[in-house]
Amino acid sequence: MIFRPTVSHAWRGIFILACLTIAPDARAGGFGIRAQSAEGFGAAIAGVAAGNALSFSYWNPAVLANVDRFQVEGVSNVIFPAISLDPAASNTVDIGKGALVPAMYMAMPLNSRMTLGMSITSPYGLATQAPTNWAGQIYGRKSEIFSINANPMLSYRVNDVLSVGVGLQVQYFKTKLTQAVDVVPFAPDAMLKADGVGVGFNLGMQLKPWAGGTIGLGYRSAISHDLDGHLTTPLGRASAAAGLTTPALVSLGVRQELNERYRVMGTVEWTNWSRLGTVPVYDGVSGGVLTTLPLRYRDGWLFSVGGEYDFSQKVTARAGVGYEIAPMNDVTRDVRLPEPNQVILSAGLSYRYSERTTLDLAITQSLGLGNGAVTIASGDPRYLGLPFSATSDLNVTIVSAGLKMKFDSLPFGIR
């Protein structure tokens, strides 16, 4: 006989499973978003920490030292996910939802050595939704994560070889997660909504130790969020609070000019997802610990290589390939977005309309490797009385466009 969770079980379940079990996002491992630069995405972000594009400052603020005049760059990414779950005893369901992810950058030199920059990005996000009456409804129906990160930065060119950069991150984080309170058809939802603001920093350096070669290293700090919100079930609405720390990220990039037309690039990226180990969840009124949440993530890695070729002074083509190690495995993979390891294939094009205006276009395909297993059984901290097992399939297409503009005069009359 299958045990059917009551509403009281759903209160515990929504906290244990949904409250900050923020599902993995196929775009960048865990619930991170890597789509921050159309030029970078055209080569699977190979070499971004060692590059020149303004949007590469997301990975390394020292990139700003390459800016020679006031610049702005806007990026738009459209995400088309094909993500399915095939439960052992039910029909296959599609849970992917498309999304639009924008980013904006600006920078202006203060003098021959210092450059001031600013970025508005969305480092974390998620949008998945399963059908109302699916086999795993008590473990997840709808998942939404939204973030905005404001990042003022300053770079300093020490000499012709070394540049450094530093920045301040102010980040808003919001989540909305739902799951059924019972296994019966049309069971009502339990819903968690919570948000918070956290502060962090970023650092970086670029070295140009030999002709045509650049090495870049960037660091984005972890950011602690005190999330406050409400848990709503058929029994009513209660205050809820929990702490979540988004992971630190380190990006190492290299670029080498082979001649006037050819360049090769590479990236190694590490994300400290393993710091999301056990998350205590609190009653928002009494402050007592309701439970602890073992996310059990491991650190994520990305390895990518790419190349660029200048067809002319106006047109540059690029391509790249990457391999990503996801932060979850067959034990910790979740129904909200079941992410396996992935191969990333990218291609892109830049068209310089004029000396001041450049258009970047890119397309990226993330291909999940194998059918990732999702298993929730007795003894699992997520278990709500109903054993669940499924295999998953993931295939995500991202189309990116970017517009770069340079200006001879600075805004506000600055000289």
Task: Show the residue positions of the predicted features.
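Outer-membrane beta-barrel porins/channels
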Residues: 27-44, 85-93, 98-415
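Bacterial N-terminal signal peptides that target proteins for export
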Residues: 2-14
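Outer-membrane beta-barrel pore proteins
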Residues: 48-70, 106-113, 125
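Residue-level micro-sites within transmembrane alpha helices that shape
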Residues: 8-11, 59, 259, 307
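Transmembrane beta-strand segments of Gram-negative outer membrane beta-barrel proteins
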Residues: 32-47, 65-82
